Amino acid sequence: MEKGFDKSAIQMVIITGLSGAGKSQAIRALEDLGFFCVDNLPPNLLPKFGELIVHSKGKINKIALVIDIRGGEFFDSLSDGLHQLGAQGIRCEILFLEASDEVLIRRYKESRRRHPLSGDARIFDSIQLERQMLADLRGRADKVIDTSDLSARQLKNQVFELFGKDARHSQLRITIVSFGYKYGTPRDADLLMDVRFLPNPFYEPALRNLTGNDEPVQEYVLSSPTTKVFMRKYYSLLRFLLPHYTKEGKSHLVVGIGCTGGKHRSVTLANRLAAALVDEDYAITVKHRDIDKDRGGGESA
């Protein structure tokens, strides 16, 4: 090996997860970012592949691999392969993609493809089996993306945010997601906060059709004494937690803030929290998941 070659400069991403969750789209996004990509690499070839990367002496330093479920030996061979890569001085990030049962079933019906574990079983049963087989691997993942509500373009954008040229320079990247409990909680959230106890702009006729991006709604929510106390305490809690997440090696944290419909209170607080955390030198992304849903419909604050 040439003197001066720094193996810590190697960025290897292993893409795995549920069949039908979008692994092919994810690796195409990484290819657009300049990664050397290999689809469907058998896990037992990981150590040999690592040797080839090291012997390239830095000519290939951004690598993305898709590794799919491959029967009962999948976990043993992958775990051993990751261990051997670590012994070679190569650290891998695991990106795990998942989606809800309903979405996966719909995707399979639309594509008319067979699930890799189907055999004679129903698609639903195959999905449940795969979830069980991948449960431990999901727990080891560095990053998890739930693609249930994502278009191909949105998934690509998330991959760009996670692995783009500036992604490695921040000690911790934080995604703050506002959402409505009536639509379910974000499946990839690490922290969830229910703010339905705060004053609800929905019941103010002049504010009902506005959102937390509008100044009148922000003033209504933030002027409440309860909101002021809550924001001070919650911000203090996050300031305590974030350095500990960083110390444990976590690179991406998803914070969910939910109200009833995801349009007023949660949007306001997500924006305000993001503005406060930017001053703490974290890379912040804000997503308002449900802000455009059910406009003019029932209770939606």
Curated annotation (Swiss-Prot):
Keyword RNA-binding assigned: no
Gene Ontology MF, one: ATP binding
Residues binding GTP are 68-71
| GTP-binding recorded as keyword | yes
Annotated ATP binding lies at 17-24
Keywords, alphabetical: ATP-binding, GTP-binding, Nucleotide-binding
UniProt xrefs under InterPro entries = P-loop_NTPase, RapZ-like, RapZ-like_N, RapZ_C
The family assignment reads:
Belongs to the RapZ-like family.
Function text: Displays ATPase and GTPase activities.
* UniProt cross-references to HAMAP family, sorted A to Z: RapZ_like
Q: What name appears for this protein in its UniProt entry?
A: Nucleotide-binding protein Helmi_06460
Organism per entry: Heliobacterium modesticaldum (strain ATCC 51547 / Ice1)
